[in-house]
Amino acid sequence: MDNTIGYIHSTESFGAVDGPGLRFIVFLQGCNMRCKYCHNPETWFTLPDEKNKAFLESHGIKVEERTAEDVLKQALRYKSYWKNGGGITVSGGEALLQIDFVIELFRLAKQEGINTCLDTSGNPFTNEEKFLEKFNTLCEYTDLFILDIKHIDEEKHKQLTGFSNKNILDMARYLSDNGKDMWIRHVLVPGITIGSTSEEYLYELAEFIKSLKTVTKVEVLPYHRLGLPKYESLGIKYPIPDILPPSEKQLSKARQILCCIV
């Protein structure tokens, strides 16, 4: 496929949470992880796989194939709203699965003087030379990385997402060592990332974040169940039906532990 073509799940014209200022958000299709609390399961299915395409279309979901130039042209309509630090954010799905497209989009954006931000789980990151060569190019065009750390414990992370967190933590260290600004995000899930009587994993995560030199913000987001109807419509069993959102007390405690680091 043309490496400047992206599989676009959707776009958002005035995003206010995925990076500084108002953002034009590009949500890319496809993700390898299967986070038990994911609220966008329709973004899992990678393309151009024909079975995945047929499945999505049978549920009324049409993913667009677009060039980076075309997406940038759409984004530029909103440039006048970015005077206070806004710009373009690419999210997912998992944006790094379409790294060639992101590189091209951000390269074009930087030519226009636009702030760029990548929201990622870090799951595709690897220290292999072939990937790092592309990742280093991406770093040249990326002003901010938002890294979602699902769980600090490797085994718990596997249970939660289906994957180890080793490469994700490696990515955080790599960004830190190479002077790339990042925000850290963490979703608070009762019984999974915070225990009923213990915050040990939050303290472990806090220690890891303290070891990073370029973290400028830490966000703790409460788990929610807003994605349940999507699972039902796709015929996918919801993995954690009995888990409720965190209490205000739990959320406040988690933010006290994590958000005061920077």
Predicted regions and their residues:
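Short glycine-enriched, charge-decorated loop/helix-capping segments at active-site entrances
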Residues: 44, 57-61, 158-164, 235-243
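Conserved AdoMet/S-adenosylmethionine-binding subsite of the radical SAM
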Residues: 72-87, 92-221, 226
